[in-house]
Amino acid sequence: LICKSTDVVLTQVSGDKNAIGYISFGSLNDTVKALKVEGVEPSTATIESGDYKIVRPFNIAVKDGLSDAAQDFENYILSSDGQDIIEKAGYIKIDKSAAAYASNNASGKIVVSGSSSVTPVMEKLAEAYQKANVQQSDSSTGIKDAINGTSDIGMASRDISDDELSQGIKSVTIAQDAIAVIVNKDNAVEDITMDEIKAIYTGSKTTWSDESK
């Protein structure tokens, strides 16, 4: 199955003993089991050390000439206040020496849209900031929304392509995330290799009989 929502992936995997999926590390909960990858368990420590290998950036896409209100929210996200919220939500802050938030006192509506992986932490940021409306979709939609002006800020849980950047937006990394490979809690598998992940997702392996225990 192709699922565009983190919640759907969690529901599918928690309800099927043979299912496998991948989600944002920050969205991991006790309804599923995260596998070790190459013997390394996903954790804040192993992500920061580089021992856990499946990592990705959380980016936002914004246009030049951002409204004062939207710029203030971006400033909040990148401040020590915003970065602390990101860390408390289970993600890796990108600036441990960020300055404290200083408001520009702007007012106005701020629309943020995009990645379902980024949405949970963006909602926490918006709740603390109290002025942003977060709309969940997917990375590509969020970037398109930023390009065409439907949103002030697009959320992406991937690198923003050169083609997308050429359409008048810039990429700002707000956090680092790991991708947790998840299985049903009743699955006996505890560890998986990168080659095994590739084989499963390319369809060359379709059973658990020869996977790591």
Identify the residue ranges that each predicted region occupies.
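Exported/periplasmic ABC-transporter solute-binding proteins
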Residues: L1-K213
